[in-house]
Amino acid sequence: MRFLIILFLIFQSNLVKAFEINGEIIQGALIIGKEQPGKSIYINKQKIKLSKNGIFVFGINYNQTGNVIIESVDKNNQITSKTYKIKKRQYKIQKIDGLHEKMVTPDQKALEIIKKENDLIKNAQLINSDFEFFLSGFSKPIDGVISGVYGSQRILNGKPRSPHLGIDFAAPKGTEVKSPADGYVTLAEKSFYFTGGSIILDHGHGVSTIYAHLDEILVRKDELIKKGQVIGKVGSTGRATGPHLHFGVNWFDAKIDPELIFN
């Protein structure tokens, strides 16, 4: 009997503890997970970074449907798997008039400029650093009124355009924009065609934030930023009808709803 009890206790101590996740599996969500260090984590067969402390993070794109399958693989190739159904959302329609026509239907020369700028933005958002700044949570970059919501279908001068994949804060020109978390500056540009004055901060593991239409940029590329540090000032540069801050969140190329990550 004593042998059986000892054997049972040994078995219990060797049970594989399943990974844990924090967050609702819904379009636009950023999900943080915890697993035993040394394992491998896969999201829908894509291997993602697992920190030395067993932390992982992934995002769900605005239009992603179906399931999220999370697999944890140990050194003996034993797999623990869980499947989650993605909750779909209904998005609003937003009409914006009064834009200069070149900002709605750019000419060929402008399209070439836009492509180069979009490549710079994409490259900055695909960085997979070891930072874990995202773990501290995110505060709002300014206290302005939200004038544009995530996921809304944009109708610009009566013409359907891409969804709005961030949120807009209406605020007076010159309002200070503060970093919502510690970060590393991967892009700081004064005059992009659509986004105007633009900053991208890397928060680690593919999580990044973008700040657009800035009147002033107060940081430099490759600079480490502290949470609450002033990084720029609100403007109306690029494609904008008035002063506001466009704030976006990415997990690599997945667009995350900023309102789901605050605090």
Predicted feature residues:
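Surface-exposed, glycine-biased beta-strand/turn segments
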Residues: T83-T195
